[in-house]
Amino acid sequence: MHPAHLLVLLAVCVSLLGASDIPPLPLNLAQFGFMIRCANGGSRSPLDYTDYGCYCGKGGRGTPVDDLDRCCQVHDECYGEAEKRLGCSPFVTLYSWKCYGKAPSCNTKTDCQRFVCNCDAKAAECFARSPYQKKNWNINTKARCK
């Protein structure tokens, strides 16, 4: 092997060893997004929910601003239960599901997959039945979420 190739290979191996401390990406967010589209019939993008109220998106605290934000609070709590009761990692748990009309249906094998899929399905259905109020998107969470 050419010395330059060996040096590159060594650099890649060292980089990969260092990358083992990097937390995994939230792989199931894409699945959750498709589930949201299933439940709402594609009427609203899943991205519309990322910075909504006090709970939709990263983190969450305070009192939910409306029913839709409450859906996100319940979803956060459901993920917390998956971690606490079953030792699941909800953000990286992939599962199998199908869309029947506007109803997501979980079809999974393990307890973690089933629990996380049900968290997502219930949240997606809750999003679909709760009004979206633009005034609650991208709010000042420091001021409103106490």
Swiss-Prot record:
Endpoints of the signal sequence: 1-27
GO molecular function: calcium ion binding; calcium-dependent phospholipase A2 activity; phospholipid binding; toxin activity
Reactions mediated catalytically: a 1,2-diacyl-sn-glycero-3-phosphocholine + H2O = a 1-acyl-sn-glycero-3-phosphocholine + a fatty acid + H(+)
Cofactor(s) in the UniProt record: Ca(2+)
Record bears the keyword Disulfide bond: yes
Keyword vocabulary terms for this entry: Calcium, Disulfide bond, Hydrolase, Lipid degradation, Lipid metabolism, Metal-binding, Myotoxin, Neurotoxin, Presynaptic neurotoxin, Secreted, Signal, Toxin
Location(s) in or outside the cell: Secreted
Disulfide bonds: 38-99, 54-145, 56-72, 71-126, 78-119, 88-112, 106-117
Effect of residue 61 to S: Almost no decrease in neurotoxicity, myotoxicity, nor in catalytic activity, no change in binding affinity to M-type receptors, no important decrease in binding affinity to N-type receptors
PROSITE patterns: PA2_ASP (PS00119), PA2_HIS (PS00118)
Chief site of localization: secreted
Effect of residue 58 to L: Almost no decrease in neurotoxicity, myotoxicity, nor in catalytic activity, no change in binding affinity to M-type receptors, no important decrease in binding affinity to N-type receptors
Active-site residues (renumbered): 75, 120
Impact reported for residue 76 to K: Complete loss of neurotoxicity and catalytic activity, no change in binding affinity to M-type receptors, 1230-fold decrease in binding affinity to N-type receptors
Cofactor note: Binds 1 Ca(2+) ion.
Ligand binding (Ca(2+)): 55, 57, 59, 76
Any one Gene Ontology cellular component term annotated for this protein: extracellular region
Gene3D superfamilies: Phospholipase A2 domain (1.20.90.10)
Pfam families: Phospholip_A2_1
Membership in a protein family: Belongs to the phospholipase A2 family. Group I subfamily. D49 sub-subfamily.
Protein's job: Snake venom phospholipase A2 (PLA2) that shows high presynaptic neurotoxicity in vertebrata that is independent of catalytic activity, as well as local myotoxicity when intramuscularly injected into mice. Blocks acetylcholine release in Aplysia neurons, and potentiates pro-inflammatory cellular signaling. Potentiates glutamate excitoxicity when coinjected into brain of rats. May act by binding in a calcium-dependent fashion and with high affinity to a neuronal-type (N-type) PLA2 receptor, and with very high affinity to a muscle-type (M-type) PLA2 receptor.
Quaternary state and interactors: Monomer.
Protein name from the UniProt record: Phospholipase A2 OS2
Organism of derivation: Oxyuranus scutellatus scutellatus
